[in-house]
């Protein structure tokens, strides 16, 4: 879409259904059937296909998560729609720290599976947990989208977030995601933050999640 002479691209993210009740957790055969319908809609430049809880659900169904990711990303790759994954930085796809060599290998595997972008976040916005993953993703040929986890407090100011973004961009992240997980981001603050980042780094893509 074009608004005010700016191109706006939409990314389809429906990750939370993987973490909801069992009846909403899709099997790989269901994902493969829904992919053509998503493509036919013609409005998404990106689709989230794995990461976070995805692989865990595949395992619960007794499916091979590697085959599942390849099968789901393939139709999007074929038509030029970028695919992306969720990555918990130091914790990779888990809920606890993962060794550096395993995380480095994970990005190579994900790239081979057809995944283009990794959205890297740390709930504490700790750059030491995010920056290594940025470097591993770049080494593997993926696009690292570094994330700012949004909240509201006297500490979490525009300048605070802009400073974190500066560090992540300096580390090599070509994209920044404003991850408003709790839905408490204030429009005025988010607007000022976006403007500040774009003024400092005009070439950087910003996504709101």
Residue ranges of predicted features:
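Alpha/beta catalytic barrel-like cores
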Residues: 12, 19-30, 34-61
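Glycine-enriched alpha-helix->loop->beta-strand junction motifs that scaffold or abut catalytic
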Residues: 43, 114-116, 140-142, 170-174, ...
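Catalytic alpha/beta core domains of metabolic enzymes, predominantly
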Residues: 181-209
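Active-site beta->alpha loop and helix N-cap motifs at the rims of alpha/beta catalytic domains
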Residues: 36, 51-169, 183-186
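N-terminal amphipathic alpha-helix/helix-capping segment at the start of soluble metabolic enzymes
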Residues: 1-21, 69-74
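Hydrophobic faces of well-ordered beta-strands that scaffold small-molecule active sites
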Residues: 8-16, 22, 45-49, 81-88, ...
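Generic, well-ordered alpha-helical scaffold segments in large soluble proteins
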Residues: 34-37, 136, 171, 196, ...
């Amino acid at each position: 879409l074009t608004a005010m002479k700016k191109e706006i691209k939409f990314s389809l993210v429906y990750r939370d259904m993987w973490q909801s009740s069992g009846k909403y957790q899709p099997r790989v055969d269901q994902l493969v059937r829904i992919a053509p319908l998503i493509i036919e809609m013609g409005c998404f430049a990106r689709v989230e296909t794995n990461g976070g809880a995805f692989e865990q659900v595949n395992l619960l169904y007794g499916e091979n998560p590697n085959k599942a990711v390849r099968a789901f990303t393939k139709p999007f790759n074929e038509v030029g729609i970028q695919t992306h994954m969720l990555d918990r930085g130091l914790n990779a796809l888990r809920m606890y720290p993962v060794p550096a060599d395993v995380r480095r290998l994970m990005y190579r595997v994900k790239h081979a599976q057809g995944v283009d972008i990794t959205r890297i976040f740390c709930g504490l916005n700790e750059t030491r947990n995010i920056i290594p993953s940025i470097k591993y993703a770049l080494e593997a040929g993926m696009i690292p989208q570094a994330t700012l986890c949004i909240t509201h407090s006297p500490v979490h100011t525009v300048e605070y977030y802009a400073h974190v973004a500066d560090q992540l961009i300096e580390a090599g992240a070509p994209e920044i995601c404003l991850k408003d997980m709790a839905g408490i981001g204030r429009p005025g603050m988010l607007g000022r933050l976006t403007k500040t980042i774009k003024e400092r780094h005009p070439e950087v893509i910003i996504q709101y999640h």
